[in-house]
Each structure stands twice: as structure tokens, then as C-alpha cells.
């Protein structure tokens, strides 16, 4: 069967389920797929984690090295987030330099970490104005079955939680745990008409192009927000999505207690 016909069949099936107020996998509209967080999966990294979100899989590795601070923050360490989306993870990804999708993914994850002040960057100063710790957070998509963003955000914070600052390697004292003080969690919803689907799968993404990602910190404060697509949200739907995102984030944050 030609690929385009198969896509149309799947799309029609998703839409028919939505008309019956159902999702194709039986989940509630505000329900995530099964989440599994596995820490310390990359032996040579300072910190790492693998997240499985349904059939979506993302691994994040953290590396650290001394470097110069940004001129406007001489008393703070530096976090740099990168994302790599390779064809192995999805036929829609192309080889080559980072495209706009990987850049946007890295930017949204970075914003959640930065705006929540998840890492105490003031404790990553070696010599103020001269040398600080640079934290490289590298996101690698292994399998994209929808909602790479939330899986990446979970994997990033999980990897940071088990990161050790490699001070001994650089003759800068003893190693110590990266000072993580918050757990930002992002929740992405697909908007289809007057309905929303939390944690959309790849098949569900075929019926709409408008998503809203809301990132909250451990105190339920919104620290980042990202909307894609052209659908205009009314105030009632936005308020509902905000409440749902906060509640989902609370549940996801409980997963960190299991690692």
C-alpha cells in the first residue's frame, strides 16, 4: 500500500476517534503515555539519562569543562544545550547540520532550565570573570514517536541531576554533584479544533499542526511557553491547558523520585 494512502487512513482513524471523544491508544485527553527515566546510561559522560515516553526515546549526555564566562554574567557558570535529530530516529529527519526543528527543540529545553534557575550557576565559578564551568547538555533523539520536546526536557533535567562536576580531572579540587535546585517540566498539547491532546503521538500529530508547550517549575510557576502553528487559542481553552499542564507536570515530577 502506498505510503500516502496509509497516512490518510491513519489520519482518518485518529479523527474518527476524536469525534467520539476518544484517543487511538485509549488514553484520556490529559494523560501522558508511560514514562520511564533511566539515569547514568553513558559511562564517559559527567551525567546522562535515557527517557522513554511511549515509543519515543531520547538520550541526553552532559559534559563539562572550564571556560570563560559570558561578559554580562562573570559570576555564573554557563549552560549550552544542543539537540541532534538524525534520520535513524525518524524518516522526516535529514542528515547534516542542525535544522530549525533541532534548534527550536534545544532552545525550548534551554529556556526551561535557564528561566527556572534549575542549576545554581553561581556555584560553578572557578575564578570570577576569568574561568567558570561550562555545562554542555547534548540531546540525541533515538526514536521519534511524537512529543520529542517533553521527552528531551525530562531527559535533560534527569541527566543534570546525576551530573558530577569533574574538578579532579582539571586539578580543581574534589568532584561534586552539580547543584540542581529545581525540576522544570514541560507539557506539550496538540490543539485540534476545541480539543487538546496532551503528549501527542506521531500519528496524532498528523491531524493538526498547532501545539502549546508550557514549562513549570516545582512551585507551579510558568517559566517558559512555546506555541507553534496558526490556531488561535481562546481564553477558556488556554486556562484549561494551563491547569492541565501544571497537574501533568506535578505527576511527571514524581518520576524523578524513582531514579
From Swiss-Prot:
One of its GO terms (molecular function) is mRNA 3'-UTR AU-rich region binding. Keywords: Cytoplasm, Exosome. One of its GO terms (cellular component) is cytoplasmic exosome (RNase complex). It holds the Pfam family RNase_PH. CDD domains: RNase_PH_archRRP42. It is found in: Cytoplasm. One of its GO terms (biological process) is rRNA catabolic process. Non-catalytic component of the exosome, which is a complex involved in RNA degradation. Contributes to the structuring of the Rrp41 active site. Component of the archaeal exosome complex. Forms a hexameric ring-like arrangement composed of 3 Rrp41-Rrp42 heterodimers. The hexameric ring associates with a trimer of Rrp4 and/or Csl4 subunits. Belongs to the RNase PH family. Rrp42 subfamily. This is Exosome complex component Rrp42. The gene is rrp42.
